[in-house]
Amino acid sequence: MDNIKLQKLTESISESDFGLSFKHTAYFNPRLRTTGGRYLLGSHDIEINPKQFEKFGETALIDIIKHELCHYHLHIQRKGYKHKDADFKKLSQKVGAPRFCAAIENYEERANYIYKCLGCGETFKRIRKVNTRKMVCGKCKGKLHLHKHIK
């Protein structure tokens, strides 16, 4: 799917589920890493993470678009567009927009380092490096050492 098809899909979802037109731009942003999409308050554009579409397909993409359109339409109408606002919760429930999307990679897949406790032998996966002079094992308070650098 390209940006033109995404734009048309967003416009059609806006018309069918919200009964309102989407007058701005929706596009894929490959720089998004930890979020499914985002609504830009300044430009009113919607950015979508292309990895979500690649991994989970069109149904996940539609859910993300619905979620971002909730932000969009509420912000345009000067209502509560944040996740905590009652207007947002009510509208997202009405249109069936999920609160979260599935993670592209889980913590285990993102881990770069494996630490091992010298006391009990427990292993810990971490994304970032840990200061082994300060950090100790959570089980036995033993000393940690870098067992393996994965990536």
Swiss-Prot record:
Start and end residues of each SprT-like domain: 7-147
Annotated residues for binding of Zn(2+): H67, H71
Cofactor note: Binds 1 zinc ion.
Active-site residues, Swiss-Prot/TrEMBL: E68
Domain of life assignment: Bacteria
Stored Pfam families: SprT-like, Zn_ribbon_SprT
GO terms assigned for molecular function: zinc ion binding
Entry keyword annotation includes Manganese: no
Subcellular localization: Cytoplasm
GO cellular component terms attached to this protein's record: cytoplasm
Record's keyword terms, sorted: Cytoplasm, Metal-binding, Zinc
Cofactor(s) it depends on: Zn(2+)
An example Gene Ontology biological process: response to stress
UniProt-listed InterPro entries: SprT-like_domain, SprT_Zn_ribbon, Uncharacterised_SprT-like
Keyword hit for Membrane: no
HAMAP family given in the database record: SprT_like (MF_00745)
Family statement drawn from the similarity comment of this UniProt entry: Belongs to the SprT family.
NCBIfam families: PRK04351.1
Full protein name: Protein SprT-like
Lineage: Bacteria, Bacillati, Bacillota, Bacilli, Bacillales
